Amino acid sequence: MLPGLRRLLQGPASACLLLTLLALPSVTPSCPMLCTCYSSPPTVSCQANNFSSVPLSLPPSTQRLFLQNNLIRSLRPGTFGPNLLTLWLFSNNLSTIHPGTFRHLQALEELDLGDNRHLRSLEPDTFQGLERLQSLHLYRCQLSSLPGNIFRGLVSLQYLYLQENSLLHLQDDLFADLANLSHLFLHGNRLRLLTEHVFRGLGSLDRLLLHGNRLQGVHRAAFHGLSRLTILYLFNNSLASLPGEALADLPALEFLRLNANPWACDCRARPLWAWFQRARVSSSDVTCATPPERQGRDLRALRDSDFQACPPPTPTRPGSRARGNSSSNHLYGVAEAGAPPADPSTLYRDLPAEDSRGRQGGDAPTEDDYWGGYGGEDQRGEQTCPGAACQAPADSRGPALSAGLRTPLLCLLPLALHHL
């Protein structure tokens, strides 16, 4: 052994050297070319690099992977490591997601596949195994339909973004496993009808956005079970009528938007008008389109005398629901020729005259309060690494020197200078 090295290993220097060796990090795969990597939490950002496929050399410890704004066309099984918590793939050219791609990502909490204009269909088991997934983004694709069991097993999901697709129909029980879902965004599609069990299972839903569709009918039981819903948007559709029974199933409703629909303020409007007389909600205008003598009036401001010429209402027991042999037009709030609308009065007789859902000791919340924490998809930008946990210099191309390694290196510096 060299004399200089023997002297270095004697005395206090040996402890300092041992501390240095213990602090050395284990060998890990390098950061993929053109990407930026951070060590805490393990993050790889490869956004906006014109990648046509996912990089092959991703560190297996990666927890957050940002691949947005590339040209990636397909995803295959085995591409992603099992430690992923966040995966952003929005604004690519995705057209195919092979079965099993996400099956082993059991820790994944957020998956963003939005703004992929070539993604026209999904396999039924695309999201199988994602039991911890909390946020799923499928907005602004070209999806025209969804398999009936596409969301099966997503028991932790809280946010589901399906807006601005080409969805024509939603199957009954499509969301049946999503007991924890609080936000469902379906606006900007081509939906024409809401069936009886389309939202069954969504007992925790707080916000439901259905504006900008082509809705012509809503089943009287479509919202049954949505006992926590506070925000409902149905504006900018093709609704001429809406069953009052449907809204009576929403005891927590606070904000309702029905504007920009061709409301028929004839006998068909009576159930909805009766609901407004008892409900305590913040609502948009409900402007009459027909008949001509009521055009431009607000449906909510009509009087009981406006419905005196209507046929006598049919008695309905509180809590009763129509069976399969009932008229489909009646169930969806569309009056048949010569058929009287159902009497809504018994549905509201037990509602309190005053709103008992206001906050104690303060003013009622405004709609802005409810949306204050929500940033639209267009506002997400191209954030490289969200959160303060992974701030690093812009030119960083690898993990920063750990604090545990700095101390022993500093203690070796004087020794090295002494033996030069």
From Swiss-Prot:
Start and end residues of each stretch annotated as Disordered: 286-399
Propeptide, residue positions: 399-420
Superkingdom of origin: Eukaryota
Domain named LRRCT: residues: 261-312
Compartments, record wording: Cell membrane; Membrane raft; Cell projection, Dendrite; Cell projection, Axon
Domain LRRNT: 31-60
Leader sequence segment: 1-30
Biological process terms in GO annotation: axon regeneration; cell surface receptor signaling pathway; corpus callosum development; negative regulation of neuron projection development
Glycosylation sites: N50, N93, N236
Keyword Disulfide bond tagged: yes
Residue spans of the LRR repeats: 61-82, 83-104, 107-129, 132-153, 156-177, 180-201, 204-225, 228-249
Post-translational modification, as annotated: Undergoes zinc metalloproteinase-mediated ectodomain shedding in neuroblastoma cells; is released both as a full-length ectodomain and an N-terminal fragment containing the leucine-rich repeat (LRR) region of the protein. N-glycosylated.
Compositional bias of kind Basic and acidic residues: 294-306, 351-360
PANTHER family cross-referenced by the UniProt entry: ANTIGEN BSP, PUTATIVE-RELATED, RETICULON 4 RECEPTOR LIKE 1
Protein name stated in the entry: Reticulon-4 receptor-like 2
Lineage of the organism: Eukaryota, Metazoa, Chordata, Craniata, Vertebrata
